[in-house]
Amino acid sequence: MTRVSNLDTPRDKKALLDKKSIISHDDLLSPKQNINDNVSNQDSSTGILDPRLPLNRREIFLLNKSWKGISRNMDIAGVKMFTKIFLKNPELLVLFRHINVQKEDHQNVEAYENSMELETHSEIVMNTIDEAISCFADYDKCHQILSSIGSFHCTIRNFKGEYFLKARDPFLQAVAEVLGDRNSENMQSIYKRAIDFILNTLCEGWKSGIELNKPKYLTTP
């Protein structure tokens, strides 16, 4: 006997198509709409997952939903961030000798935007932030990732942990530009606390690396 598929009847096929239509419609909603529509499905508790985390459950949920919009444009956001960093702190370019921007172009936005080397480096940095945000609810995992990367930077000659903090405002500005009108006051507050945690943990990791490797790595004063 030939087995009849569950989709052999016109009614079943129509039901499947209707279901797909609903999914497609939801996917077309803006990130802002998706965030608002799904918050009610999450734990509305304001309790902190871990007392060392700067965000509660709902805020971490909102951060992850919003970050999806950024992650689709990470290359753009990353270049925007580093361009702002270098425009304000051109002296840091000595740490990025692989980025081919001539001295006379240090205040030229297009020079940074057209740099393939900067785009590549920006992508690496933004992937690190992406990894941290994706596991933000797991303090130990997130802290370990960031501390390890921060510690690695103690091997870079003349690099100082405080340089991480110079990325704070440029990051927030880049996020605001990419999100546009979806960057509500609430999301601004969430991103500020998230990036402060990320950058401070990187800085702490650098300090730990310096302490552990003092005999091997010496930085100039």
List where the protein language model places each region.
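Globin-like tetrapyrrole-binding proteins
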Residues: 1-221
